[in-house]
Amino acid sequence: MDSTFSGIEIGKRSLFAHKDAMNTVGHNLSNATKPGYSRQRVTMKTEIPLYAPQLNRAKKQGQLGQGIVVQSIDRVKDELLNTRIIEESHRLGYWTSQDKFISILEDVYNEPEDQSIRKRLNDFWESWHDLANQPQGLAERKIILERGKSFCEGIRNRFHSLERIYIMANDEIKITTDEANNYIRNIANLNKQISKSQAMKDNPNDLMDARDLMVEKLGNIISVSIENKQDPNEFLIHAEGRHLVQGSIANEFKLEATNGPTRTRWNILWANNDKAYLKTGKLGSLLNIRDEEIKNEINELNNIAANIIEIVNEIHEAGRGMDKKNGRSFFSQELKLTDDRGRYDTNGNGQFDSVHIFKINSTNEIFPEEKLGFYGTLKFEATNSNEIVEIPYNAPDTVQDVINRINNSNAQVTARINSEGKLEIKAVKEQEDENITFKIKHIEDSGSFLTKYTGILNASGPEGAYDYKNIDTTDKLAPKSTYSISPLKNPAAWIKVADIIDSDPSKIASGIKNPTNEISIGDNQAALRISSFGNSQIMIGKNLTLNDYFANTASNIAIKGQISEITKESQSQILKDLTDLRMSISGVNKDEELANMIEFQQAFIAASKFITVSVELIDTVINKMGV
């Protein structure tokens, strides 16, 4: 029922309600520049009036109002828009990181023209051409030595530059994973606090803002989805179908240190120790950069180093220096297999288990336009696969037709006719675990092309096949065929001119031994063959020439850089538009808040005056009516 003091109670309620509203305005203005803050507003409701419709109600006119109270303090938030921003954040995180590291990779290739690897290599071939014109010249040999050392230095410098970028990406993976775990822990902790606050029927707006901001930052690192049920303990964050957060439970990522191609490699694991193959967000980008982009660049550099070492040494070992001796390599053969049949202990158990042969040269001289006159099927293992590639040949086919089919297939070998007119089968680079390998895996011929015609294999069919898993597989090769053993690991890191050549340039070969094992004065065949490699079809992987290789390498990284830059800018604009839209809804408008402050201030003053009048009425009743 109403009373003499009901006026004071109504005024008090208004006073407190508008004071809370003014405090909320002040809170909004104080946090106007804080990232992630959502504008708050006070929702007021009219207090339940007198009298309730019941039998014992007072016999007077009603209902009589009881003033106003604060119902809730709410965030102004568009949850659907917020979810959209979180969904878009991982794309910006991915392409920002991608653009950063691709730009760093581009800087490695943006060498001064006169210091580029391509220029150094061209100068190296040119110096061999000069020696071919003056095969007895010591000065020409000294120039070859210096240019060879310069080329090796360029290869090693690029390798170490790529290695440093690999280490940067690897370190950033660890840092970013720790950052993600920090967000996951904090979100779970905030869920616990929010749950307690909501249990008291409060709206923990600032805690929820802090949680939303952390979820958004986590969404930049990895693509996440949110499931916010009515039960606050069931605020879920999913990533790649896994629970990262469930209420106050945090399932953090784990880091596992393994051996990488150059240094320690960090693997990301889920909470249950399964390996996390992340494809989105900043972490997905870093994994792609480290395990694909940088590793591919290192592998390509190893590819060119291994091939140039091989083709130059093959001719140089057959040639003779000024002392008329042969059998000397121009480039160092460090880190090669010690077994002369290419047998290798892969498992480290003390027993050979595979054969690593890089290149095989046939016994017989062949001619590209010669028709075969017979038919059969070649079988090779596919690149980075255990599948078999079959390449048929028929009687009307020429030798070059068969070579083209091999090179245009997915076989993990290439073929060409070398400078001696013999068929050369060479392995292309493959990725095994964390390292690049150069080894021929399988060669088989149902007919006579690789047996009687070229002289690579002893016999046709499966029983005559070369297979690297058979440690005696070199017995399957024709007796007079020759082969080269594979480099073990990162030839680009250790490539250098052999010490014996470095100490005495006169040992650089210019001529080729003849059938009488003598060398003729003025013989320039070794120098001439090596100088021709600059424009010859020597097959660096699937590239025909060195020029093709350099052109493809440079264009590939340039295209990737352009794509990453454009996509990052596009994604950044999309996220900016969404963020601007969110700010127009949830952001603090200072003019609007100041207008609200004046409104609430006037209401507060009115309430205080009403209380003053109510007190005067009570004073009249008590002191002036003689009661």
UniProtKB/Swiss-Prot annotation:
User: Which Pfam families would you find in this protein's record?
Assistant: Flagellin_IN, Flg_bbr_C, FlgK_D1
Q: What is this protein called?
A: Flagellar hook-associated protein 1
**Chain ranges passing through the membrane:** none
InterPro entries registered for this protein in UniProt: Flagellin_hook_IN_motif (IPR010810), Flg_bb/hook_C_dom (IPR010930), FlgK (IPR002371), FlgK_helical (IPR053927)
Q: Does the keyword Repeat apply?
A: no
**Subcellular location, in the record's words?**
Secreted; Bacterial flagellum
Where does it mainly reside? secreted
The UniProt entry's GO CC annotations, sorted and at most eight, read: bacterial-type flagellum hook; cytosol; extracellular region
GO annotations under biological process? bacterial-type flagellum assembly
Keyword vocabulary terms for this entry: Bacterial flagellum, Secreted
Q: Which gene encodes it?
A: flgK
Molecular function terms from GO: structural molecule activity
The record's family statement is:
Belongs to the flagella basal body rod proteins family.
